Structure formats: structure tokens, C-alpha cells
Amino acid sequence: MTATAQQLEFLKNSIKSIQDYPKPGILFRDVTSLLEDPKAYTLSIELLVERYKKAGITKVVGTEARGFLFGAPVALGLGVGFVPVRKPRKLPRETIAETYELEYGTDQLEIHVDAIKPGDNVLVVDDLLATGGTIEATVKLIRRLGGKVTDAAFIINLFDLGGEQRLEKQGITCYSLVPFPGH
């Protein structure tokens, strides 16, 4: 099932836009409204599974927190394991960490050291691509463990914030279901 224009428009219309959230001047794209609609949520998962079902994916990685909501069902649809990437001190076993830049400071992500095996073909899934910093850090973690990452999938791409270009420089092909301007 290739995504039709009608299906993609349905998904786009299921995402509410909230003006001046979380601060004045921001138009927030609320993917939780898509999650509230079982038809939209199911369709988004089905379209991602269809795109990657013949790609030889061996693991799906999702980044905290909304990446879990899309990554885990995609992993199930592909018949592979799901690996969460989380904020510091949220994973119980031994982890490695990657620090990345935020607009005002830095943050860190962690992954279990035994979650990715050398040679795993990994798909990264998240709800939204903006500047790409979080996904770039996630990709670095996977590669440090020997995993191969060439693709990342998103529900929303805020296309004018530069995330796709940033990830392409890291050898990552980005796919998103719904493009929106970021400003």
C-alpha cells in the first residue's frame, strides 16, 4: 500500500495546530490528536511498515517519548525488536550516552549497551523532525554500538528547520508522512 494523497491529507488534518505554544510565536503541531483517532494512528503505522517491510530492518529505535508511540508498533509490524533511547538514568542496565546541543544548553540520551548488535540494520522512528539534533544523537549511539543506520522515519517534518539536511549529511535518508512549515 503506497500512501495516497488522500491518505496523507487525512493524516495532516488529524494533527491539530496550537498557536503560541509552548511560547509566543510558536505554532505547535500536536501529534497527540492523531493518536486520539484510531483510524489515523493505524494508518500512520501501516504506511511506515509498508515502506520498510522489505528493507531488511533488524531493529527499530525510538527516541523518548513520542518516538516510542510510533516506533514500537512499527517494530511489531516489521516483526523485529524495539529499542528505546531515553533521557539519562531512565534505563536500568548498563548504558552509553550521547550529549547533544539544545537551543539553550545541552541534553543527553542513553541506550542499553547490549540493545544493538554489530551489523544490526536499524530504522529510527520519531514523531517529529525539527532541527535533527535528537535524531543525530540517537544515530551516533546506534553507530557506536556497531549498528547500521541509513533511514529515519517521522510522522511530521517541520521542513524549514533544517533537520532533514542535517541528517542527510550523516548519511540518513529521512521519510515523513506529513510536512509542515516550522514557523
Swiss-Prot record:
Disulfide bonds: none annotated. One of its GO terms (cellular component) is cytosol. Keywords: Cytoplasm, Glycosyltransferase, Purine salvage, Transferase. Pathway: Purine metabolism; AMP biosynthesis via salvage pathway; AMP from adenine: step 1/1. GO terms for biological process: adenine salvage; AMP salvage; purine ribonucleoside salvage. Its EC number is 2.4.2.7. It holds the Pfam family Pribosyltran. Catalyzes a salvage reaction resulting in the formation of AMP, that is energically less costly than de novo synthesis. Belongs to the purine/pyrimidine phosphoribosyltransferase family. This is Adenine phosphoribosyltransferase. The lineage of its organism: Bacteria, Pseudomonadati, Pseudomonadota, Gammaproteobacteria, Enterobacterales. The gene is apt.
